[in-house]
Curated annotation (Swiss-Prot):
Membrane-traversing stretches: 27-49
Pfam families: ATP-synt_B
Membrane topology: Single-pass membrane protein
Name used for this protein in its record: ATP synthase subunit b, plastid
Amino acid sequence: MKNVTDSFLSLGHWSSAGSFGLNTDILATNLINLSVVLGVLIFFGKGVLSDLLDNRKRRILKTIQNSEELGVGAVEKLEKARARLRKVKTEAEQFLVNGYFDIEQEKLNLIKSTYNTLEQLENDKNENLRFEQQRVIYQVRQRFFQKALQRAIGTLNGCLNNELHLRTISANIGMLGTIKEITD
């Protein structure tokens, strides 16, 4: 490694007349060398730098265009969402109004149904009362006729002889059969 370093140092000490060498003294370099280096950099670097700047410009413009498209799309989506929100609000209000109407309608139907049920129960009660009254009247009549018949038989038994007694019993049995047929 030391040989390589020595060879570079020896190049710096060569005389400038008739030979080519590197001048390691930065302050001693002349304006021409700097101009040549800058010219080479500008000539070869100009295309690369121009391409880099053009690519960067295209990317920036494309990003701006994409951002604008996304912004327009976002505005459209926002408008659609607002329209959907208005529609949902309208439907909700309609459901609310319909809900109140349905509740009132159900309430009226329930009241009407309850009234009809109570009326039917009242009719059934009255019919049952009439039936029970008829049954009680029938039973009272039956008992009355039985008592009257027993009294009549008792009176007849005390007053009549056997032959008259048998004829009376036969007649009463016939009357009872007729009464039974009428009531059935």
